[in-house]
Curated annotation (Swiss-Prot):
The lineage of its organism: Eukaryota, Viridiplantae, Streptophyta, Embryophyta, Tracheophyta. Transmembrane segments: none annotated. This is Auxin response factor 17. Auxin response factors (ARFs) are transcriptional factors that bind specifically to the DNA sequence 5'-TGTCTC-3' found in the auxin-responsive promoter elements (AuxREs). Could act as transcriptional activator or repressor. Formation of heterodimers with Aux/IAA proteins may alter their ability to modulate early auxin response genes expression. CDD domains: B3_DNA (cd10017).
Length: 585
């Protein structure tokens, strides 16, 4: 059966069953549910449109919204699935969640009893040959196709498969050859010609029940000869279709073709209108085509908020999930954060793609050098990474009123990007100097925060968005010295004395009066030696001394500096009358 005809200007798109839509889009694609809280990122919307960024407004502010309408549709010409969303920008009071777990994840409504068994295959030149057949992987034949009757020779059956538009196709499934293999023969060439499939495209076979089979298509993008992508006219859905001036359909009309550049599916006018309406607080609509290498630009608020509450630093090991080509499983790739800020490019200072990752397998992820914080997860806790840098705790800062600015657990979350009120003053640049960071942070790359406001954006007018607690403006902190960053006792009394972990804690008495002269003795192991830390504190800066196991003492200035990345060539030793008899280690 031939699929229904469609014209390039047809906007009567057919809604697709959500389970079939998600199977065609891929398991890694996340579409928030109706009435959920989301953030709209204009940068991602622009990336889905065209590379001519200069024609669009350079907005870098994420817009908090509520989804008021969702349509899961399929392109009438290419069979590619896409989502049409209507978003309503929200104010701070309207956007605050009623029940929100800071590190929780919003999974939406998933019906376990309505899942689809899926298998996708990238077409080989033989599969895409007009007169050839389709070689069916054994896993697909066993898990998606109905079982063959192997009592007959050769085992053969007829399959009736429904495409994304509801058209039914029939294929002959046979098990033959030397060695024997599963093949689709009769009916396959007709399907290839009708769908204009080429080698590199993917077909997705889906089984929803014992007698319901579906087939979908994923197009492979092909760059133009000049490396760019020009735009072909059309509506906001069919924005990259054109009509051939040479090839004709059977009825004599111009043959419809489409670009495979990966861009141009959306018009610049539609994207510009959406960005302008969003900035004015008006409802706006967006169209999203899920595709490999493109990030969702309408993201669940819970995912963004939990990821932006993390204190991302260079050297952090992360992992990212990616769907395999056959959609059979999710593969996790690991890497190390090399940069947490975009110094160049059109989105400089924006949280969009702010993390630069050095992957363990760069040849596989060579086109995924920058990702969004919500696309990755911490691969392991700091104590599991065997890194020379100790785990740094989040600091508690005094408010101007004398109390502490804290979250639910009593600790302030450093606002990673500047998504807060413009009324907040800039933090003092001195608090970001190398000398005032804990020793484990001295190896991290720092930036000139003199022109960096608390929202993380460059310039003097930070956006009036992202006003949740974890994105609240910092108070006027002044200078933070090593008085606030002293070595404390290990978090557990049962910690092994041979542990190589160096524990760092923030000062718990940042404001108020200190007690009388006191002495603390703690120990850490550094470069194979046990170091005893003695602290004398009175009303004022703490005086610390580092004592080795043999009783000798290393003098320390008020601003303690420890470089954990390289052992010092020599450590001067001074006698300590308070220590016991010394011995050679």
């Amino acid at each position: 059966m031939s699929p229904p005809s469609a014209t390039a200007g047809d906007i009567n798109h057919r809604e697709v069953d959500p389970t079939i839509w998600r199977a065609c889009a891929g398991a890694s694609v996340q579409i928030p549910v109706l009435h959920s809280r989301v953030y709209y990122f204009p940068q991602g919307h622009v990336e889905h449109c065209c590379p001519l960024l200069s024609t669009l407004p350079s907005s870098t502010s994420p817009v908090p919204c509520i989804i008021t309408s969702i349509q899961l549709l399929a392109d009438p010409v290419t069979d590619e699935v896409f989502a049409h969303l209507i978003l309503q920008p929200m104010t701070q009071q309207q956007f605050t969640p009623t029940n929100y777990s800071r590190f929780g994840r919003f999974d939406g409504d998933v019906d376990d009893n309505n899942k689809v068994t899926t298998f996708a295959k990238i077409l080989t030149p033989s599969d895409a040959n007009n007169g050839g057949g389709f070689s069916v992987p054994r896993f697909c034949a066993d898990s998606v196709f109905p079982l063959l009757n192997f009592q007959i020779d050769p085992p053969v059956q007829k399959l009736y498969v429904t495409d994304i538009h509801g058209a039914v196709w029939d294929f002959r499934h046979i098990y033959r050859g030397t060695p024997r293999r599963h093949l689709l023969t009769t009916g396959w060439s007709k399907f290839v010609n009708s769908k204009k499939l080429i080698a590199g495209d993917s077909v997705v076979f889906m089984r929803k029940s014992a007698d319901e089979m579906f087939i979908g298509v994923r197009r492979t993008p092909i760059s133009s000869s000049d490396g760019g992508s020009s735009y072909y006219g059309g509506d906001e859905y069919n924005g990259y279709y054109s009509q051939s001036s040479v090839a004709k359909e059977d009825d004599g009309s111009p043959k419809k073709t489409f670009r495979r550049s990966g861009n141009g599916k959306l018009t610049a006018e539609a994207v510009t209108d959406a960005i302008n309406r969003a900035s004015q607080g008006l409802p706006f609509e967006v169209v999203f085509y899920p595709a490999a290498g493109w990030s969702e630009f309408v993201v669940r608020a819970e995912d963004v908020e939990s990821s932006m509450s993390m204190y991302w630093t260079p050297g952090t090991r992360v992992k990212m999930a990616m769907e395999t080509e056959d959609s059979s499983r999710i593969t996790w790739f690991q890497g190390i954060v090399s940069s947490t800020y975009q110094e160049t490019g059109p989105w400089r200072g924006s949280p969009w793609k702010q993390l630069q990752i050095t992957w363990d397998e760069p040849e596989i992820l060579q086109n995924v050098k920058r990702v969004n914080p919500w696309q990755v997860e911490i691969a392991a806790h700091a104590t599991q990474l065997h890194t020379p840098f100790p785990p740094a705790k989040r600091l508690k800062y005094p408010q101007p009123g004398g109390g502490f600015l804290s979250g639910d657990d009593g600790e302030i979350l450093y606002p990673q990007s500047g998504l807060s009120s413009a009324a907040a003053p800039d933090p003092s640049p001195s608090m970001f100097s190398y000398s005032t960071f804990p020793a484990g942070m001295q190896g991290a790359r720092q930036y000139d925060f003199g022109s960096f406001n608390p929202t993380g954006f460059i310039g003097g007018n930070p956006p009036q968005l992202f006003t949740n607690n974890f994105l609240s403006p910092l108070p006027d902190l002044g200078k933070v010295s090593t008085e606030m960053m002293n070595f404390g006792s290990p978090p557990s009394d049962n910690l092994s004395p041979n542990s190589n972990t160096t524990n760092l804690s923030s000062g718990n008495d940042l404001v108020g009066n200190r007690g009388p002269l006191s002495k603390k003795v703690n120990s850490i192991q550094l470069f194979g030696k046990i170091i005893t830390v003695e602290e004398h504190s009175e009303s004022g800066p703490a005086e610390s001394g580092l004592c080795e196991e043999d009783g000798s003492k290393e003098s320390s200035d008020n601003e303690t500096q420890l470089s954990l990345s390289h052992a010092p060539p020599s450590v001067p030793k001074h006698s300590n009358s308070n220590a016991g008899s010394s011995s050679q280690g």
